[in-house]
Amino acid sequence: MESKKNSYYKNVMDKIYAKEKDVLSINKDFQENNLTRISLILNYKDFYLKFDESLHGYSFGYVTNLFGLKLYSPFTETVRFDDTEKYMKTILGVPSNEALPQLCSDQHQNFEEKDPQIEILPSPQQQQQQQQQQQQQQQQQQQQQQQQQQQQQQQQQQQQLTPPPSPPLLPIPQPPAQNEEQQLTQPPSIPPPQQKQIKIQKSDRGTQVKSITNPVNSLSKYINNSSLDYSIKKNYTLEEIYENNKNYMDKTNNFLHFLFTFIDKTTIKDLEHFEKEISRVHNIEKLINEQNVKGETPLHSLILYNSESCLKKLVIAKINCMGIFDYSKCDNLNKNLLTHAIEKGDFEIIKLVLIGGCPLKMSPRSKLFKQNFKLYRQQIYRVFEIKEFLTELGFNQFIPMFLEYEFKNINIYYQIKSFIMVLTLNADEILRWKSLLEPNKNLDLDSFCIEYQIKDQNGSESQLMADHFKKVCQLNSLFGYIDFHTQIGSAGNASVFEGTYKGMPIACKEMPVSGTYEQRVDSIKEIAAVGQIEDLGGCTVVKTVGVLKYNEKLFLVMVKEKCNLLSFLSNKSEILKMQRGGIWTSIFKISKEILKGLISLREVGMYHRDFKTANFLVSNTGKILISDFGTSRDENEKRFNTFAKTIGTLWYRCPRLGDCSGDEKTLNHYNEKSEIYSLGIILWELICIAMTGTYVSPKIALFQNEVDFSIWIHKDYRFSFPIGTPQSLVKLITSMCLPCRDRRPTVHQILDEVGIIETEFLSNRGIKGEQTYSGLECWREFNFSKQNVFGISISNLHDTEYKAVNKYNYTSYNNKNSLLMKRYLDNSNFVVELINPNGIFKFKSFFEKEKLLYLKLKSTYKGEYYFDMGKFLTTIIQIHQITEIYYKMLQKYRELGLLRNNNNNINNNNNNNNNCNNSKKFKTTSESTSALGSDASSSSSPSSSSPSPKYSASIYHHQ
């Protein structure tokens, strides 16, 4: 079939092209216009022919007309051919209005019956008929001209007879005789000034418009004197209407969007013409399914922006017959054609849409779920109205499908009697409703493991997990709805979405049951942990509703609370509220609720193992609840004896190693004291909020890299507290963050101590004791004695370099910034030399040929990287902060009279510095410490030559 069609049209086009070439080579009129040639397009769905060769040796691109002839000249844009009629007569031997329909016939299904060798040219009888019609038209025109001349002569005679005082009355010239249809359809024309007339020649396929010399003037004429209605009445093609009115259309829409938007301006007389034009669109299947920015297809525009019109229904019926529209397409509001048709209330359009195969579904109405019960009741009545509406249409077979969809997405929550009364359901539908109200099932571990291909656990662990599983219920999916477009958070690698269950707002955590085997096992253990804390009743932990299977995914459903503690503390408005009501009262309240939550977990024998502010939720009533039990484990679990690498969050995680005991098992075992460290970091965050009024994160960055705050904690080390922090809280948090777990207090001791501090603090309404300076007290208590210093191996750093800045692009910085960076690093080296006089640890910066800036940490012991924790203070706090702290220490100790140096010592120290072997390292020290005067230089030399005493204060007065 296709080969026959192609051969047929190939022969026709070859004959046309050969004759066209001969005519264009002789005719000077065509050559003077510099026209390449005409592209004759045969518009059919299964093939598309065109010729783009140039007769004058030029190769030009051109835009083809979707409906007929169009030309592209090398000097102008796409224009209409000036001499279309002359061209068609010369080449084809017939007028253009008869030649083109024969080549572009709509009924392409009859092609197989035609002989490909027969040339489609008009017969002599047809030519005679055409000539007779032309002669009749010419005679009519001559008669009209004669009538006009007679009228003009009569007017002149009247002017001569009229008296001179009175002005002559000019009669209005009568228009030429027209058909009745033209007189009814043609609107009054107002010729614009300085505008060329455009001749329109009618044909069966439409009109051929002459070339537009001034497109701006011509477009203004169409805008002023015509509309879509007028264009259709004048038998313009669809593309001609689009070209004349495209200024009104957005660039994101195609021309079908535009035409269907204004289709209600046409009349019933144009239906046949419009139906033909729809069939002639070459790529209509692509255009009819294109979506604009709003996600609307042309049929969406047809239904949304038009009132009731016969043409609108004709278009939908025509598209249904062609079977080219995808009725599953929805706009950005997730509304399909049926939804818009129901909102419009047009019964006939709904019938046509349903016949076309549009699915019976409504858009998700998640906003209604967040409102009160009244909106839910209105939702029920809307379901009733739709059911009655479908019954009136005679589409009872669609009702079960509609109800099934609505049950899964609308989450109807109401009493069964009310549903029966409102919806007037029959016996079968009542059974369907009752099936929705089945009680929730409890989870079974064995069936769960079989479904997700998980091997049986150890005997004791399996029995323990099975007992916990029985306490978790599997929710009815018909009552659940999850909005995947709204992600409200994340828990580890899992995403948390917003949803509703029986009208209640919920938070749905996606379980990775389709991931790796370890992820599936962790999912089971998290569900078991949920069952383990079920006995707590939600007083200190977030309330878990159950497990929901939704769209072939498994979700852990929890009650949606206000926000997490991290977001709460980072919100300035919430901090202002706490300050108005007494910020210390709020801090003590939050601290005690966190401690009580930890005690409740210990009562059921559970370790959370990931305490941080992001895993505590603030309820709608202001209570602090524990959440995210993805890493939690039972204390009797065997696998729990080894310390997993992924336990906890970096900044809140307990140091992995400490000088607590020599037993490796005790060293690696995770116990209650391991979580005390995380609580200490959380309390430190709360203290910073109370003292500074802003949230301070424990996450400390060294340039672009993140340094683990907790790994480098040394014995008796305390990070800095804001000025004015109560000494009792400083001591408590310091004891909670000790590297040795055995020395940390228990959770009950901490709760009692917080209660005592709260009573003392609130009763005195002030701070007792000496005010602390930022970092000063920490440094005074920092122990540098060698007996307490031990080396700790850093994994995966064998013979490697620690790159703090991967690539420092000096081209993006000027020379001033580069010098500041170098001075900044030299100051850091200076501080490191003061802290580390023996040179065990080096912190260096250097420049290479490739202009890469590295920060090397060099200290080798037994082939691995070892660091003296007492000398590694530079990685705990940003180095510029250490420098500032050091300057403040010098000033403070000078005020206290603890620095015992004189001018002689200063001079001697300066001389020693000049003769030092490491003079290159201190090259810029005098520049960077010039603001300190002589104290900075006096403290550098002795510290670099003599061993370090017990306290850091002794570094600066070691005599």
Swiss-Prot record:
Region annotation (Disordered) ranges: 154-213, 904-959
Entries under InterPro entries matching the protein: Ankyrin_rpt-contain_sf, Kinase-like_dom_sf, Prot_kinase_dom, Ser/Thr_kinase_AS, Ser/Thr_Kinases-Pseudokinases
Domain Protein kinase per the UniProt entry, residue ranges: 482-762
Biased composition (Pro residues): 162-176
The keyword Cytoplasm appears for this protein: no
PROSITE patterns hit by this protein: PROTEIN_KINASE_DOM, PROTEIN_KINASE_ST
Segments forming a coiled coil: none
Catalytic machinery residues: 610
Per-repeat ranges for ANK: 294-324, 333-362
Record-given protein name: Probable serine/threonine-protein kinase DDB_G0291664
Alphabetized GO MF terms: ATP binding; protein kinase activity; protein serine kinase activity; protein serine/threonine kinase activity
Annotated Gene Ontology cellular component terms: cytoplasm
One GO BP: signal transduction
Lineage of origin: Eukaryota, Amoebozoa, Evosea, Eumycetozoa, Dictyostelia
Domain of life: Eukaryota
